[in-house]
């Protein structure tokens, strides 16, 4: 059965030794298996990665890899149609699949007693799937995937990706079409096309199986052998060869977007594929140019020219090709020539100053600590082992690759700048609001694109459950029709020990000791959010929180504060919500005291930098304007207006309104901070390998200097209005989908019935195993997903059900929503309740 076995111990990250022990072996049919034991939690993750993605497709048959991923969730010979959704839910687990340009992956994370059942399920769709494919099932999934594509395209910049690919890649290049493909290609797919794709790419020799988590290795090997070893092998397909893009000239293109309210510019320079020796210095080059307040592109485009709220520049490397790219959405009515020129001014400034060695060191530290974060769950660890094995044959590649990043020098960075960026041809795509061609980069030509219209929409499948044709069973050495029992190692519900202390200034602190990784996670929660903002100063809580992070301190400029955190590899954020204000962060255990000193400076002595204030205000105003451009946000705002009223904070959210934010001053923020930033209305939560004594010692400055004060907690009326039973329509011209939301006022999280409501909603619309999803997607194909939920807030309470549906299916979708929700009480049974409680207990 086994061709070879190897055990490797991997070490990475000098901040603290981190090891992943794994065993890799290969079955006779070519399936590569990787086992990683992690007993820290009683769960197990199973993942399979096939080396096939959209890059393996042909012109005229695009979208097949992603479409096939969908098909594998339908059924197999021994799994009834759509049972994958219900079985994983009943085990208290989670699952999904994903398709990239270069691979397709499936995963499950379940309590440890579900391992054998999951292996049975995965092996069944690997080796016992293809005979079950029917024309009806094919057509239903074509409808679902078509609506997934429409959902992405029905909003601002939804077509920008297709425009970019057409003009960046040469015709026929493996990356020249989107992963989801073209709707006309999907609608022309046949059962024979699916079978051909399966036989070529879904062979064991083209796959890697990873099991990571709490399991017995010997038993796992027996299960893998039992369920996978007999699957017929086949030749391993040749991987798609590297095909780097070369541009004979710079190309400039524009596309008029009927939904966009602000221009967007994408620029890309051809570079190299993943794992190429130049990809590592290119990663740091991009960060040095655009990452951080002191980077040249940020300084010029954001601070000096004030063209956008943020910028970025990234080395985007995949298996076949790579690029250094940026996508920036500007403020409304910005001429994209001005942004385009900023890039070249930034390049010039970078050349003049050279590589900032301190910044390079910070970026290396951040990358290294980020590796620890990628070791935080069995699923992420399994994914890293999968990718390394699929593309290099080395499961530990992500860890050994660390040395490639750490060894990058300033000379390497300047070399790749000269080789790939300076004076090189590139592609620029300007996506501009319809009718504003003058905002496009000068010299751009109009993109020649054709997209599906509403008149062209069609539904391939017939409504109702897919009728399954009889099929021939594939012979097996075991009885695969029998669903395996759960293993005997069912985990007990084990709530971690939580310690509590109240500091002398009144701050309540709760914590959990966790030594799995050398990181500490912390969160300050201030019981004061937008719900307490005066109506005329709506948004003051949110803007104050943003200024704590962006405005520096009394002794540090905004740039110095950002760099001080970055020196420790710490990630710190501050933001306001409707009901609370949050300051969250993570850092190495050993740096916690130093990071707390910086956090104390933020909380107690904000810098109130005026330039940072103006930028923060402009950023929030930009967010408010953008929130008025998508179907979902427009519908949600209308729903909340009906529920709460036009000027209510729950309608407008934590940002406030354009009028109130424009009127806010620095004095308003200082006044808010002075009145409400008190430890008496704050709490702190912390998880890491630190004792309460160590934490208290690290926070001594904050404890000493953060003085308690009395706080006025009066606020707005929090009761929703009595809603009439009406249907409201909002026109969103030309959209290929309709967004539906319906609901009413809900329960407070403090209400005794709030948890019961969550249990009741579980089967209605909480997940892909619920009734709304089952009927609107799986049985009708009208949508990519349909869900419902109760908001979990103390005051901002509502129940809502929602979905983005095919435009031509709007009326029947609304009728189905009303029918399902209205009749839910009549079909809800004691058995459904017991199954829900059982799965929710297991999931916890």
Segments predicted by a language model, with ranges:
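Metal-associated gating/positioning segment near the N- to mid-region
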Residues: 71-79, 86
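Proteolytic maturation boundary segments
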Residues: 8-32, 216-257, 264, 299, ...
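Alpha-helical scaffold elements lining the catalytic groove of polysaccharide deacetylases
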Residues: 185-190, 194, 660-664, 669
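Sec-dependent signal peptide recognition
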Residues: 1-5
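M16 family metallopeptidases and their MPP-like homologs
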Residues: 36, 41-57, 63-67, 82-128, ...
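Non-catalytic, conformational "gating/processing" segments within enzyme and secreted inhibitor domains
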Residues: 135, 142, 195-227, 425, ...
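Short, conserved secondary-structure transition motifs
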Residues: 145-152, 243-256, 363-374, 587-588, ...
